[in-house]
Amino acid sequence: MYKRQEDNLLKLDMLGHDDPTMIRMLEDLTGVNARQIPLDDPDTMSIFVSSKVLGFENDELLGPTGAVAIPEFNTRFTRGMLMDTLPKDFNTLVRLSGFSHGTDVWLGNARELIVSGTASVLETVGCRDDIMLYLISMGLDPKMSFKIMEAVRKGKVKKGGFQEGWVEAMQEHNVPQWYIDSLAKIGYLFPKAHAVAYVMMAFRIAWFKVHRPLAFYATFFTVRAKAFDAEYCCAGMDAVKQKIREIENNKDATDVEQNLLVTPVSYTHLRAHETSA
């Protein structure tokens, strides 16, 4: 609704973030300085593809990855993205963050290019900066590269097409046609610095999940739990699974029911940690 009135309204995006609070609590509980956590820790990186390092694999409710309860990668949508791309490094996670925060960047665009084998993850456009840097690397004039990036990331190319001479310039410098077509589909692109900040925070939290699990779960339920039912959480894995299915199958589930964080609770049972009231 606001997009139809945005030229006449002052809109303030005042976003709250729980992640810094989680980091502080995790540091207090463990004595680990989060800023010293290596962003290439192999065990932590592995949970974005598999849950094996957590002590279980391919759970029927949690799926194949270990990314549940990790910021940026906690939704079914982003976990599906992980399975389509199988990230092996931090740079790829940043690209995925760009995909998820952009508009018309992943579905119907980068995903199809990656799944079909037309392009690798790092060859596709994830963040606005990717366009300018890539076009400059292909030999385009830096000023034109910047203008193309700005027009694409604001959705102007999608709405009105490329300016005269842009497509010809890209073709003259051997920019693939699939790349040009991809640019024309984009409605909005996330800035890379923002994506890097989000993924750094997510990776540090993921490190605690792998290496300091009890502190991680205690912090998660303290900071992020919008609703919590101790009765079934303490009743064992079967009760947790039953509750998950009840909520998923109930089309009239309340907001409180939707917010019951039963999935992370099932993690604690799978990893042999006891939840007690």
PLM regions and their residue ranges:
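Noncatalytic, beta-rich nucleic-acid-contacting surfaces in large DNA/RNA-processing enzymes
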Residues: 3-271, 276-277
